């Protein structure tokens, strides 16, 4: 995780070292970004920690929505949530996207997997429309616990398929992938 923050710091610094306005970093995602299950999330969610590391020259926004899916036909599409609208209005100079884990739900991936890459690219494009100079970082999904109640139902295999789809998006868009867990 420290390596991730070092990469983020270097990329952020390279974007606008001379800028007088704060550099805006939009953290887009699900409950992991939001900080669900993290003790004292207002202090310990990763966007808050990132803000502390980057300092006063940056404004980090936490636009995580618990349960959000990347898939537009998923059970809780991120693009239909208020957090998405808020993230667009924020118009980040850097956009960190960490979505996909909730798409492993049996209501989502088996039915709409063919739309995942297109939906992901459309999400990126929507942020480019509000800030054409935005820089993107796409996060690999968090590891899936074998204690998860759906682990044996196919979720484990879908998780790997989604990881591969995320890598395809990153390659197609020329966007750097990051990993919170290496």
Residue ranges and their predicted role:
Residues 11, 52-54, 64, 128, ...:
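A generic structural signal for short, solvent-exposed coil/turn residues
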Residues 20, 78-182:
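Alpha-helical cap/lid subdomain in secreted, periplasmic
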Residues 5, 47, 124:
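Generic structural marker for isolated residues within well-ordered, non-membrane alpha-helices
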